[in-house]
From Swiss-Prot:
Effect seen on changing I221T: In strain: CD95/407-
Pfam family, one: Fe_dep_repr_C
Superkingdom of the source species: Bacteria
InterPro entries for this protein: DtxR/IdeR_SH3 (IPR040767), DtxR_MntR_Metal-Reg (IPR050536), Fe-transptr_FeoA-like (IPR007167), Fe_dep_repressor (IPR001367), Fe_dep_repressor_sf (IPR036421), FeoA_core_dom (IPR038157), HTH_DTXR (IPR022687), Iron_dep_repressor (IPR022689)
Keyword DNA-binding annotated: yes
Function: Iron-binding repressor of the dipheteria toxin gene expression. May serve as a global regulator of gene expression. Represses ripA under iron excess.
Compartments, record wording: Cytoplasm
Result after altering V174A: In strain: 1030(-)
Organism: Corynebacterium diphtheriae (strain ATCC 700971 / NCTC 13129 / Biotype gravis)
Protein name: Diphtheria toxin repressor
Effect of mutating H201R: In strain: CD95/305-
Effect caused by changing V147A: In strain: C7(-), C7hm723(-), 1030(-), CD95/305-, CD95/211- and CD95/407-
Amino acid sequence: MKDLVDTTEMYLRTIYELEEEGVTPLRARIAERLEQSGPTVSQTVARMERDGLVVVASDRSLQMTPTGRTLATAVMRKHRLAERLLTDIIGLDINKVHDEACRWEHVMSDEVERRLVKVLKDVSRSPFGNPIPGLDELGVGNSDAAVPGTRVIDAATSMPRKVRIVQINEIFQVETDQFTQLLDADIRVGSEVEIVDRDGHITLSHNGKDVELIDDLAHTIRIEEL
């Protein structure tokens, strides 16, 4: 039963992530993200639809019901609170934080959540600049405001300029090679980097190191002008 619950939560969180990125949540996108077969995803989505968690719209996009969104919000809140705990208190290496938080999100109790918001200094955003949603349910106030700034893919031009990193989406954190390149260049949320689009290839430069972003990930980092 626990595996079934974890799978449901994982699917809902993936839909939530896609929405955050401005990507239409389709079964094909879930199959790509979770590395599952098309038939497996279709069966799981059908079960979630029967359970009243999602609706398959006429354009085949997946829309969360109010019940589904409440559950997705809770899972993402636990995930990002865990990321803050792992980073701010435990001091886990930043490249391990996301994967560890993925395990914690399924087992963290409501009581632990309420303690965390009292212990942690900053519960507005994750260490990667992502808003921690649904804090009003913990009596902290709502943090669902949109992240400031612009997606790299929408901001880069052929003229190099300095910008500040304000958000690194969840999907970027699981792309190990690209994320490692970013960390090796000491690029974090808050870093001031040079951004340029060279013939359709977007590059971030920091401390003398260049990171050429994979095309499929250029929408997953947000920046703001200096």
